């Protein structure tokens, strides 16, 4: 009898040791994605009811976690104890430690990006840390080490709980009956309330068990399916997109300025993407402290209302080149495709096309290069390949790589000109990546000062590039796009700037300059929001190249109809990223928060948001926002499927680029 009692005490302690951190993880996660725990969770779970807060938690939020832990313990017992014959104490303590490690890793991900881990972002994180091991030291703070020590101590909970129960039983033998009674109550609660919460709630994302959510997230690799039996035609895709993107329909085309056809001729095109460049910290336009950018802005199309199409570099580049939103699903595009992107179209007009990465293109494996091949770039270089591995101080090395990338871009343009051809070059800069550069005269500088120093370094590189063009007689023969790929993404970036982690301008609003002295004798400032998807059609129109018959979801940025168009800001559409999808229409940004099924709205460029239910005077209701987000995602998925079919079933044979 004593052995059975000891086992029951140990099982009870094991369950408690698994349940408590699970609930901590669950509430930490929901707090991160919903806001204030004491008010938001209760409203989200049973909006519009008068139920007491404690009942909302007991009935809707935690039951599925009791059930998750019950199934977890049962599975561990069956596999570890029955099949593998692992000693119960070792199995219990080892599983608790494993749970704490796995849950802690997910909490770090939630803290940094607002989402749990997926296989993709585990691989990305692993590869990035391998390239930047210094990041590990930044995470090993005294607070985190204290939490690690607490976790190690907690692993002994099953043993300590069983020992405490034995002592209690020795003093009060009748107390042992409490264990089976409590077990029966927990089992009943888990099966009845847990199943109802997880499967019977319309808000199952909140009610679902934490570990169920983790498994679902980890197995989510690519939510979209580009291989479909039925794929809309190009005209059907455009019609569907216009229906969702232009809520009031489209008027006749009119333009901010009219550029005569005599000036819309082929020019050398260079696109520079600035890594992690929120407009708030990269005010490039009309900034006298950045003389090169200031001079460029005087003869350019500029905007303070430009938005990235995704908070990921490779997806942002996809949109810039193709003129379409990136496909929902994994942020790593694994399938092959063929688009009407700039590299393909300009190659067909005699351009020499190339892509230059200012770091190491292969740090995350071969898929980034394959993506660029499918985007139509036959020539791909990276600065590490050209300059070699690090041999100097880290910041000097980064600046050296950037300088090498700019010089290589200049050589491509000059070389094409000498062959009486035009060049299309994309330069993906890396200098703005966190951890920010340190000014050499101030090793202890604030994060804004460090970003300002980065902008000044970039300004000198652009001055060097422009001088090189002028020396070769090409100063007026270029169209240069300077654009941020995306804004901030990780909590460490926000914290370094003493900024709250908010899904909005700091993530998506980026600088934009389209410098072309042969096209813009004066500055042209756009008053309405634009997107990365507008770059490709705008470039083609400015070069006088017809784009009829090609599929673009973007529009010429000079077209005033864009004032009535929705600009989409997707994130939850991509697995492992912040769980909200937004769009801007007019002066409002509407956000659908996936996990908590809540719609918020905020004024463009404002930080505070409010529930859309509290703004009944606005043109969109919660149902409208959900419908728009869902319809847009469907269009983006269908567009990806259309491009996939082009690759595998091109007229007359395979469209393979290999």
Region annotations inferred by a language model:
Residues 303, 314-323, 497-548:
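Substrate-binding rim/cap in mid-to-C-terminal beta-strand-loop elements of soluble/periplasmic
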Residues 447, 470, 474-477, 481-520:
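Histidine-centered active-site microenvironments of extracellular/periplasmic hydrolases
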Residues 443-461:
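Active-site-proximal segments of metal-dependent phosphoesterases and phosphodiesterases across multiple
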Residues 2-218:
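Transmembrane and membrane-interface helices of multi-pass
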Residues 57-63, 329-333, 393-397, 448-452, ...:
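Active-site rim elements
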Residues 188-271, 276-443, 453, 543, ...:
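Active-site-proximal alpha/beta segments of enzymes that process anionic O-linked groups
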Residues 6-13, 87-89, 162-167, 180-185, ...:
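Membrane-interface soluble catalytic domains
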Residues 413, 417, 466, 479-481, ...:
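Short, hydrophobic alpha-helical segments
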């Amino acid at each position: 009898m004593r052995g059975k009692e000891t086992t029951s005490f140990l099982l009870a302690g094991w369950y408690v040791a698994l349940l408590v951190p699970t609930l901590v993880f669950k509430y930490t996660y929901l707090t991160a994605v919903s806001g204030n725990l004491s008010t938001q969770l209760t409203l989200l779970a049973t909006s519009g009811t008068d139920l007491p807060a404690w009942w909302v938690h007991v009935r809707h939020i935690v039951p599925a976690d009791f059930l998750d832990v019950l199934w977890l313990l049962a599975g561990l017992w069956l596999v570890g104890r029955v099949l593998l014959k692992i000693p119960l104490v070792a199995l219990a303590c080892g599983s608790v430690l494993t749970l704490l490690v796995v849950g802690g890793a997910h909490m770090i991900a939630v803290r940094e990006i607002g989402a749990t881990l997926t296989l993709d972002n585990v691989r990305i994180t692993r590869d990035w840390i391998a390239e930047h091991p210094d990041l590990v030291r930044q995470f090993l703070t005294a607070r985190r080490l204290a939490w690690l020590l607490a976790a190690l101590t907690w692993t002994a909970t099953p043993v300590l709980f069983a020992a405490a129960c034995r002592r209690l039983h020795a003093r009060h033998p009748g107390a042992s009956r409490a264990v089976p009674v409590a077990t029966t109550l927990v089992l009943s609660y888990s099966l009845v309330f847990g199943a109802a919460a997880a499967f019977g709630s319309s808000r199952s994302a909140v009610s679902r068990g934490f570990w169920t959510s983790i498994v679902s997230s980890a197995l989510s690799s690519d939510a979209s399916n580009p291989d479909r039996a039925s794929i809309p035609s190009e005209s059907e895709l455009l019609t569907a997109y216009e229906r969702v993107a232009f809520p009031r329909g489209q008027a006749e085309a009119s333009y901010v300025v009219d550029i005569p056809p005599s000036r819309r001729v082929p020019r050398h095109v260079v696109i520079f993407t600035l890594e992690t460049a929120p407009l708030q910290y990269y005010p490039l336009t009309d900034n006298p402290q950045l003389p090169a950018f200031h001079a460029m802005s005087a003869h350019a199309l500029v905007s303070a209302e430009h938005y990235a199409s995704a908070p990921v570099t490779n997806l942002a580049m996809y949109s810039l080149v193709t003129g379409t939103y990136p496909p929902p699903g994994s942020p790593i595009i694994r399938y092959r495709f063929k688009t009407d992107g700039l590299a393909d179209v300009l190659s067909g007009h005699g351009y020499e096309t190339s892509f230059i990465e200012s770091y190491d293109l292969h740090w995350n494996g071969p898929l980034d290069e394959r993506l660029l091949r499918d985007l139509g770039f036959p020539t791909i270089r990276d600065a590490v390949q050209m300059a070699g591995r690090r041999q100097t101080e880290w910041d000097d090395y980064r600046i050296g790589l950037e300088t090498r990338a700019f010089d290589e871009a200049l050589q491509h343009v000059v070389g094409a000109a000498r062959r009486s051809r035009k060049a299309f070059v994309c330069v993906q800069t890396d200098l703005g990546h966190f951890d920010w550069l340190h000014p050499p005269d101030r090793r202890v500088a604030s994060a804004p000062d460090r970003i300002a120093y980065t902008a000044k370094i970039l300004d000198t590189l652009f001055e060097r590039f422009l001088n090189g063009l002028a020396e070769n007689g090409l100063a007026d023969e270029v169209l240069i796009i300077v654009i941020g790929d995306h804004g901030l993404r990780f909590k460490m970036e926000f914290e370094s700037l003493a900024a709250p982690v908010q899904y909005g301008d700091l993530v998506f609003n980026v600088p934009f300059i389209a410098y072309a002295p042969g096209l813009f004798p004066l500055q042209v400032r756009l008053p309405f929001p634009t997107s990365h998807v507008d770059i490709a059609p705008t470039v083609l129109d400015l070069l006088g190249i017809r784009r009829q018959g090609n599929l673009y979801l973007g529009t010429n940025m000079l077209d005033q109809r864009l004032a009535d168009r929705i600009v989409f800001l997707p994130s939850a559409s991509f697995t492992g990223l912040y769980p909200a999808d937004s769009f801007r229409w007019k002066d409002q940004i509407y956000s659908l928060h996936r996990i908590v099924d809540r719609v918020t709205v905020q004024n463009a460029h404002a930080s505070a948001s409010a529930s859309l239910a509290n703004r009944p005077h606005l043109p969109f209701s919660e149902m409208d926002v959900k419908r728009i987000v869902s319809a847009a995602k469907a269009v983006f998925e269908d567009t990806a499927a259309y491009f996939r079919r082009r690759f595998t079933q091109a007229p007359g044979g395979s469209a393979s680029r290999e």
